[in-house]
Amino acid sequence: MKTWSFTQYEHLEYLQELTNANAKLKTIIGNDYMVAPDVVVYRMPIDDEELNRPFTVVDDETATMTEIRSINNSRPLLLASVSAKWTMRSDRAQNSRTEALNLIRNRKGQAPHIVVVTGEPLPSRIASLALGTGDIDCMYHFALYELVKAVEEYGAENGRDDIVEQLDTLIAGKRLKDISDLPLDLAI
């Protein structure tokens, strides 16, 4: 599914058509506005009958511009973009950050949740992406509890309290969570 398939980014389809038709425009604008998330979570707009169950919420005079109403919008709404990175080399971390910034910068309307799922075993590499200015909502580790145990054991055996502290900081700061938290966080 192309990013422009979603209501927040539908204008990018028109921009793509313009740049494809005009070489000068393409050299000026480029195409860095296009994002290809690994996984997307979206919902379709809802018809008024469903929205008005069990009592009236919308009518011809209220909520006339909201994209959640199917009468106003036929495209899906992007709720979350998930970047999947098995490991976190610095270039991979930068790709996730670039994807996130493009989604934030190029949207019209509500920003989707922007998260990264990883299996990276090194806290310093996780921190390279998890710490930052909020372009990534949160990182999720596919085996966080096992990682914490392994880092604590390694840190104790090798006098590396720094890596234990770094991992604790990421977790306490709500920058890193276990993958089991992801579905519930996206439900909010």
State where each predicted segment sits:
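Active-site metal-binding core of divalent-cation-utilizing nuclease and nuclease-like domains
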Residues: 2-73
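Active-site-adjacent loop/helix micro-motif of nuclease/hydrolase catalytic cores
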Residues: 49-54, 87-99, 110, 124-127
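Short, surface-exposed connector motifs at secondary-structure boundaries
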Residues: 77-81, 108-111
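Conserved catalytic-core segments centered on acid/base and nucleophilic motifs
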Residues: 81-84, 89, 103
